[in-house]
């Protein structure tokens, strides 16, 4: 399998896991890594939270050795605090520091962070320069096609980030106003790839091997990134890798495999967050895993009531009995 470099970091050219707040935590990342994700990015980390010593923020920075190559993603609107936070991230030894300039969530945008920075290119460039100046590793920037369909500026923005010292960029082919609706415009990613000399990661609507191959071919990007397409499907990374290598689809996972993965994932969440908090957070993951099963609406509602790991085991037994007719 081919590889490419972000700075001095070698990454296999299969598929990366996108940074997703409150989703791509350590347990989620480890599951995706086990199934072949070639590059992982953390949940977004508040630059000011890090600078002001917030313990919850600091916990987001903790890396397991098996997660590498790995990026910690910072967000913020103030170049000074972004630079200071990048310096603090050095103690966690990330392979890469990524800057979030693409998050569409109103709370983040309202503070001038995330995709709001696409409307403030000078501030965005200053942030990138400050992070590059303070980081001991390559710096990348993730952004969108633009703010809305009338202000598509990803190409100019990518050039600006390259000039500011970014070692790679990630472009999500949707605008901020689209959020996650409609289709991602892969042509924008292609244009970005043609405009800069640094590597370009493409993001948006990659959900399987066929769509991954199509994005590589249509955009010329150096790596594809999968976000929502991995919900309840960490094996999507294995599927992508196999398809890219052979041109063949792997068989659908069996119900037994799916339940075994869900069980392992929830056990990992509880390992890192404790059973009480872990099972609260596991509920949404379980709801994704049971999608498409017999009586999935009822099962998803049942997931919302999972309080203990024993509740989970009991639900899995019922699902297997129902699906397999035992």
Briefly describe each language-model feature range.
Residues 1-326:
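Flavin-dependent oxidoreductase catalytic cores
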């Amino acid at each position: 399998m081919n590889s490419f470099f972000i700075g001095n970091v070698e990454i296999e050219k299969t598929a990366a896991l996108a940074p997703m707040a409150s989703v791509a935590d350590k347990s989620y990342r480890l599951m995706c890594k086990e199934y072949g994700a070639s590059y992982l990015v953390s949940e977004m980390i508040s630059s000011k939270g890090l600078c002001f010593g917030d313990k919850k923020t600091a916990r987001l920075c903790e890396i397991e050795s098996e997660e590498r190559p790995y990026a910690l993603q910072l967000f913020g609107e103030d170049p000074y605090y972004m630079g200071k936070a990048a310096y603090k991230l050095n103690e966690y030894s990330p392979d890469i520091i990524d800057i979030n300039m693409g998050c569409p969530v109103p709370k983040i945008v309202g503070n001038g962070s995330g995709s709001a920075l696409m409307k403030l290119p000078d501030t965005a460039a200053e942030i990138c320069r400050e992070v590059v100046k303070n980081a001991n590793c390559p710096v990348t920037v993730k952004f969108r096609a633009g703010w809305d369909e009338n202000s598509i500026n990803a190409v100019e923005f990518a050039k600006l980030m390259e000039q500011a010292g970014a070692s790679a960029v990630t472009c999500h082919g949707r605008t901020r106003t689209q959020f996650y609706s409609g289709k991602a415009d892969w042509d924008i990613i292609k244009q970005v790839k043609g405009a800069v000399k640094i590597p370009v990661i493409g993001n948006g609507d990659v959900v399987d091997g066929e769509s991954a191959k199509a994005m590589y071919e249509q955009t010329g990007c150096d790596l594809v990134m999968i976000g929502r397409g991995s919900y309840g499907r960490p094996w999507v990374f294995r599927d992508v890798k196999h398809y890219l290598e052979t041109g063949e689809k792997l068989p659908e996972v069996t119900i037994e495999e799916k339940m075994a993965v869900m069980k392992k994932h929830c056990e990992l969440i509880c390992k890192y967050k404790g059973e009480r908090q872990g099972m609260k957070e596991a509920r949404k993951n379980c709801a994704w895993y049971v999608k498409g099963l017999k009586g999935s609406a009822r099962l998803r509602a049942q997931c919302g009531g999972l309080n203990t790991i024993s509740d989970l085991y009991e639900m899995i037994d019922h699902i297997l009995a129902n699906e397999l007719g035992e």
